Amino acid sequence: VLGQMVLLLLPACAAGLITGFLLSSVHIQLVAGGGFLVTLALGSVNLLRTWNQAGQPGSAATDHLMIALCLLLIMTCIGMAVGINVLWTPPVMPYGTLHLVAYTHTAFLGFFLQATVAGLSYALPALLAAQRVTSHKKRVAYQDTLAQIANRWRALQVSTLSFGTLGLVLVASLTWNLPLSSNWIQAGTWGSLGLLL
């Protein structure tokens, strides 16, 4: 029941956020963002509960999915804080448009990358096994072997993708004080992209 409620509320809250953005109404954005935050928290609790009750060991896909959910929760909290900041006159934390764009896009990039890698880690072994092996009995064994290969370095996969995303957040925060042509920003950008690869 909780899972169905989450699946119904997430699109409704996302539609509310989009409506708030289109109407440039911070109040609508905050209400929809609050609903989105509560729905995400309920979805995370439901996912963790289902995962624990299933008794299955974790995999790279589940690790990436949990980090993607954490990034989405953090991004929603930051978005609500920015909305509350905008309502105050003068704003408690003055920031430029470039900084706001950098933070929101970096958080979204982290969520998108983690969710994409989670989907690939889950679906790729099954797709490759279905394409390469015609016998059903051999396909299951081949798929298990591919899943083991995908999970072999799962801690390294998750950590490099996470640190690459955090590195981009650091680069975004460095733009407050340094020009874009700075060696620090260029080194941070290339180092983060190297971790993401």
Language model feature labels by segment:
Residues 1-197:
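Hydrophobic alpha-helical transmembrane segments of multi-pass integral membrane proteins
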